Amino acid sequence: MKKWMTFLCILLLCSSQTLLSVSAAPAKSVSSTPRQTQITVRTATNFKTESDVKKFVQLASKYKISVIYLNVKQDEDDEVPSGYVYYKSKVAPIAKGYRNFDILKSMIKEAHKKSIKVYAWVPQFHDRAALKKYPNAQMKTLVGKKTVAYNQNGEYFVNPLNKKIQKYEISILKEISKKYDVDG
């Protein structure tokens, strides 16, 4: 027992010296990277018209917001079925009320005028539209049974390991990145 105590004391002293030598190093200078102020915004509850976008961007600029995370694909079922998009898509179904109003195009145009970046928020696997397209791609339990809905709307998650789902979700990301001048 005495040998172990001696060993532990020596180990503690060695590690203390190592810590002291590391902490004795001169401090690095603070990065000159400008701070970003970000906001995440849901489309269905905030934007129905071009005017809504303009007002929002004016406020964002006033409060020095530098990045807007814009929900471009629905992930809940309270306003719009999940998986429906808010931009002109050839891949995913377009949400009701957005066939003639491309929120992503509008937000990018207005935000970039004020030097505000726009990041496309694209939820992936809570996707009723994908489940309609690929009914066998529903998430399953470890024993192979379909998962039960987590709410009264009957909403399910699609399986992220399913190759068809992966291809579908990636095609949405590619479409956005090719078609729009998003910043992230």
Model-predicted segments: where are they?
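Positively charged n-region of N-terminal signal peptides that target proteins for export
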Residues: M1-W4
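Aromatic- and glycine-enriched glycan-recognition loops and surfaces
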Residues: T45-Y63, K90-K114
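N-terminal carbohydrate-binding accessory modules
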Residues: A25-I39, S51, L59
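Catalytic domains of carbohydrate-active enzymes, especially glycoside hydrolases
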Residues: D52-E79, K179-V182
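Glycine-rich, proline-tolerant flexible connector loops at the mouths of alpha/beta enzymes
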Residues: V72-K96
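Glycine-rich, aromatic-flanked loop segments that form ligand/cofactor-binding clefts
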Residues: S66-V72, I103-A149, G184
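Active-site-adjacent "subsite" loops/lids of carbohydrate-active enzymes
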Residues: S31-Q38, A44-N46, F125-Y180
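Sec-dependent signal peptide cleavage junction
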Residues: S15-S29
